[in-house]
Amino acid sequence: GFDLYCKMLRRAVDSLKGKKSGGGTATLRLDFVATEEGAFASGGDLAASFVPHSYMPESKMRIDAHRRMAEAASRDEIDQLRAAWRDRFGPLPPAVENALLCAAIKLEATRRRIPMVEVRGEKLMLTRGGSFVLIGGRFPRLTAPDPDSRLREVLTCLEKMPCR
C-alpha cells in the first residue's frame, strides 16, 4: 500500500515537472516476509521486514523511514540510510536490515527490468517482458535454510542476472 502511494506520488510530481516517469519500481511478493509488526507477531517462520515501534517510537519517523526506503534510487542511498539510522537510533534490528534488503532487491530488479519478484515456497518467480524467467526450463529454487538468508539469496540471484 505505502509503496504504491509513493510510486503514484513520484509519478505525479514527475508529471508536474514535465519529466517522463521511468517504468516504476519492481513489486515484491515474498511469501516468507512479514511487512507489518502484527503479521510478524502472529507467528510463523517469517522474515520481519519493517521499522518496528521499538526502534523508532514515533509513527511519523517510521512513515518517513519507509518513504525514504521506497524512494531510494541507488544502493549507495540505501547504505546512507543504514548509516544515518545507526548513528541516530543505534544498531539496526533485523527487521530494519531486512526492510533495507527488500529495498535493494527492488532496486536490482528494476535495474534488470524485472517488474515482479515473487517467491512461492522454494520457487523464485521473476517476470521480464511479460514472461517468467526460467533457468533450464524451471523456476530458480531458493535453498537457504531460514527466511533472513532467503532474502539475501533472492538479492544474490538478481545480482547474477544480466541487465537488459
Language model regions located:
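Accessory helical-bundle/CTD segments and flexible terminal tails appended to RecA-like ATPase motors
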Residues: 1-164
